[in-house]
């Protein structure tokens, strides 16, 4: 058995957990709450991730715990803020499979007031007229409704009978009472924009039509829904969080787990895009539909829920959130963020090694906007993107670095506990500030470049470059971790200190010095996730049934999300492992790797080690397959043909290489601006798990590309990027 949800009862110091067992039964469990803290103590028997001694205090009484915190308030405390629910889940459910959840998809329709119009969620003065739910564990689509006064009861009943499981009620109160009974065995309730509409509206109407005490029927453990104010896209709103029975807004799930931007997130647009299905169309207003065509009104409401159910049947986003929650021992709503789930994953990894993690650093949400455009303080330099060389290019190849940021963190053993020191970025800060200054152009003051734009052309801090160039005349200041007084050295002295002193140290492109005499918790966790994902991908490949393929695919995707989320969490001040130095070390070292990759590729082709050389037309991570036609001295052939004709072959790193020195290929000599035939270095092939698409143009030319390949298309006079699956007949392809 595994958990669905949990709450902390602070009055009784108990953690209440609700489970769903393998037979589909709901089971309630209680655990004593564990309040734990550690404090610095030279004689302590426990060890932090920094390898320093601490002493543990644990109590099942919150009052005793608070008292102990005050006693040790003059000392550094550790883990004093770890959520007792997560601590309970880690202890009791860490290796337990996620349960099969009872899912309920929901959509409501509300009445219209001729004077006041439709009601807002904070004052739901209009009654709910219809509710449709899909109870996935039963496979039933059920509608409850109050018919319009324009119909007799007999006429309305005759219409309702044309649908399966559709029931009419004389009053809204009777209908809502039936709704609460229908959802009683649901674990998760989900709708489209249900956070912003359905849930708060239902809460408001249940309180008015029935009684406030009936709101407890939305929750478990006799709890009441909890009001929560939130802001999204600059607009403030409110909703309610239900307890024990989890609510997940499917629109927000879709936005979170779909990595491409959509032109519209309306249910109709997403249903058409994902399923080829749409909402029921009607003329006039929904109120007119309700009163004038009750049949289509019911059909409209039911179709919305069908779309939701069909979307989840295809996308499985709730199952994905369920796996993520249980893989990291957090609650389902926690997966909608990025910080808390990453925090707990790292905590679990540290605890496996018997190590203690720090408490969170205090910060103000109002003072930090890490992704804001107006405030650049606290932001890290972003990724390097090469300027595209505009035009049509033939024989384009691509190199894709696997998991660049996670691999960079692992390569330099980056973690808060492995930082030795930081070269003060005095020159870099001055340079960036100067670049960002507003400038007077003619008689007009022009706003300076953004923080990101100011980093253009830089692949590391100026201090890092000085060290790597061993500049004797450049003085640098190092702030050492745990040492109050900084030291001053010349850049060449820093190089020798890092690389020739016998210390197991490394230097990031941010000028951060890391140690590697032991593996950091975060690099170790990333290595584990990466290796585990490879195993899961292999099991998916070996699976023979549709169910097994979906099972292993879901699990490997969890690891992918974990890998990709960790870097962003480290740059978020709300993360207990937040450290700007690690974030910028990751991006700048990633830039340096990309620079070397581009330079080396250009050197292989042109002989010049130059990152923006003639052979580099763009920086991207996609790949193109082997069917492009190549002109050779033996005639036109595909890359695959060229590989097959190789008379010199070898294997390396899971790839097969071939070469034939008797065949020359045609390429452009950019110095002479003329085509010429020369020998090629080699052709290699390797297995890929990505889907392939054949793109055929109007002249009959064909090119095979992978599913994640970006194709530039002209649409309405604009250049846009499409994936192969998004192409339609008639698209004007500018470049592949």
What are these model-predicted stretches?
Residues 288-424, 428-442, 548-600, 605, ...:
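Common nucleic-acid-contacting/processivity interface regions adjacent to the catalytic cores
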Residues 8, 14-19, 24-42, 86, ...:
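Conserved RNase H-like, two-metal-ion catalytic cores of nucleic-acid enzymes
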Residues 184-202, 207, 250-342:
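Acidic, Mg2+-coordinating catalytic module of metal-dependent nucleases/exonucleases
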Residues 623-736:
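HINT superfamily self-processing domains
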Residues 106, 248-249, 391-404, 530-533:
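Conserved catalytic palm subdomain of right-hand nucleotidyl-transferase polymerases, strongest
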Residues 91-99, 381-395, 608-609, 630, ...:
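A short acidic-Thr-Gly-centered motif at the start of a beta-strand
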Residues 401-612, 623:
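Helical catalytic core of nucleic-acid polymerases
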Residues 144-262:
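Conserved DEDDh/DEDDy metal-dependent 3′-5′ exonuclease domain
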